Amino acid sequence: MNLLAVRDLAVARGGLRAVEGVCFNLNAGGALVLRGPNGIGKTTLLRTLAGLQPLVSGVIEAAPDAIAYAGHSDGLKPALTVTENLRFWAEIFGGRNIDAALEAMNLRDLANRPAHALSAGQKRRLGLARLMVTGRPVWLLDEPTVSLDRDSVALFAAMLRAHLGRGGAAVIATHIDLGLPEAEILELGPFRASELRRQSRPAGFNEAFG
C-alpha cells in the first residue's frame, strides 16, 4: 500500500532552491533515510512534505491526515503534565494509545510531571511519544535522536520498528544507525537528490538495534 508518493519535487529555503529532483514511493512498512551534509536541505524537504511550507514544483501525494511531523521543536505545553500533553495531542489528532506511548518511551514514572520540569532528553522522549498518539501512518522525523542517550535511542528505535511492523512508514533525517537495514537511502547533494539505494548493514552495527 502506497502511503506517500513524491515526484520530481523541488524545495526552497529563504527564496533559494535547495534541492530538486526528489522522487520516491513510500509503502506500508517502508522507511526512507535522508542523508547529506548539514545545511543541504533535509529539514526543508521534511517541512515541505509535512505541508509546513510550499513546494517549488513537483507532486506530493498522501492520504488526508496521513502525516505526523517531529521536527526540532518538541511541541510541548510546559504547564501540562506528561500525560496531559499526550492527551492533548491525542484529542487534536483523534488518536489514542496514551498508555502505550508512555510505555514505549519509558515515561510512566514521569507521567504526572509538568513538561517544564523535564530534562532535555525527557522532553525529547515525550515529543517522540507524541507520534504514537496521533494515529498517523507516516512519520516525518528530523534528527529524532538529538538529546537522547544510548538507552533512549534504543527505545525510540524499538518504537519506530514497531510502527513499521504495524504497517506504518517513516522518512528520517539522521546519521544515527536505528537498526533499519532494509531502509532505503536518499542522498541529498547540492541542488539534486540521488537515486535511491538500499541501506547496508554498516561496520560496527549496534546489535542492540538488531
Swiss-Prot record:
It holds the Pfam family ABC_tran. Its EC number is 7.6.2.5. PROSITE patterns: ABC_TRANSPORTER_1, ABC_TRANSPORTER_2, CCMA. The keyword Nucleotide-binding applies. SUPFAM superfamilies: P-loop containing nucleoside triphosphate hydrolases (SSF52540). One of its GO terms (cellular component) is plasma membrane. GO terms for biological process: cytochrome complex assembly. It comes from the Bacteria. InterPro entries: AAA+_ATPase (IPR003593), ABC_transporter-like_ATP-bd (IPR003439), ABC_transporter-like_CS (IPR017871), ABC_transptr_haem_export_CcmA (IPR005895), P-loop_NTPase (IPR027417). It is a peripheral membrane protein. Disulfide bonds: none annotated. ATP binds at residues 36-43. Its main location: membrane. It catalyses: heme b(in) + ATP + H2O = heme b(out) + ADP + phosphate + H(+). Belongs to the ABC transporter superfamily. CcmA exporter (TC 3.A.1.107) family. This is Cytochrome c biogenesis ATP-binding export protein CcmA. The gene is ccmA.
